[in-house]
């Protein structure tokens, strides 16, 4: 029996062959290879892309019931990532994360999650009716960012909630730090609890020994992995890797099908196929070059007065067992400006767009799509930034914001989300139970999640983020003059 090679792209190749046959199409999409589309957009996108913007007709397989080229592409991805099964997601990693949670949890089931999870985890908890048991991540006081969860916090949570249906871990974090995932997996498996990994920012780590251990290498049961973020596929295309044992693979397939559009994007699927090929066949060399380039940037930034780019010196705690050096965190705290101010300045003065900013930092991602031309421009821009804002630093101006305690969960997120609610002024909200998500996006980590008790400290933290110009999102009232809370009833007198 013929076995496909990692150098092959069964899905992409079949799409190209189909387009070359130039069939007469009496099926959707209605633009018919671009002929029925606005000419300006058609010219910009190009004929080849529009020719493979197709639908799941018989010759092209079906993502919901793959038997041909999609199955072959998914099987190759499973082999490349060390999984037993891989499912392509065109709902992004958010769709894959929601699939993981809903595959193991039903109404009332407990799931152990770090409090710094992405909104998609909380959305899945609301849909499933699961009860989140929050584990507090380690906070870095200097950088003002959350790291991963520690082995101690996982052990404590497992001892107190041994009936949990799943443990969710972020590996690595948005900022590139990773805990000892292998030990966490072993600990959870000793309780027969499956480990679900949010690997949104770690598609590349599987392909280089110097990077943190990947979810599949660590023995995790499922991992939602963003190929588009750092692996070279198109935006919104991701994969869900699964190992057999503690999870029901057929149930996983049913859930991801429920959450996936039936109008499948073959352009996104093809981009996953070719990205897998490149990672599997060239990934190690490409990532090695990327690491070297990123380290050059890190060293150069640390030579700039008042700027700091963390590296290996951050390692040594349970939550910082390893890190991804391709994530360039630039702390501007000592310059006396916020990360958001630095982001805006870089955009306006150098036409540079960063991944995200927060109160203290900007985050830049170096991938194998970068060259020294781009990184040298970044270094020059940061040198200029330091020189311009040096006066504030010399005067001792410092941005200081206390990170508040995690709010107490009073109601399950599902109960809170579907409860009767009312809208009250922002300044009167302390002590009430929130019905909305409130988060800074990116990274999309909730400040409040439905069901939590609003505290004055957290309201002040939101206000500080707003004053700094950061994108606070979630509430119906985008001005944040009001918040939606659970309705209170007064007793009948």
Curated annotation (Swiss-Prot):
Its main location: cytoplasm. Keywords: Cytoplasm, Decarboxylase, Lyase, Polyamine biosynthesis, Putrescine biosynthesis, Pyridoxal phosphate, Spermidine biosynthesis. It catalyses: L-arginine + H(+) = agmatine + CO2. Pathway: Amine and polyamine biosynthesis; agmatine biosynthesis; agmatine from L-arginine: step 1/1. Its cofactor is pyridoxal 5'-phosphate. The modification N6-(pyridoxal phosphate)lysine is found at residue 229. It is an enzyme of class 4 (lyase). This is Arginine decarboxylase. It comes from Bacillus anthracis. The gene is speA.
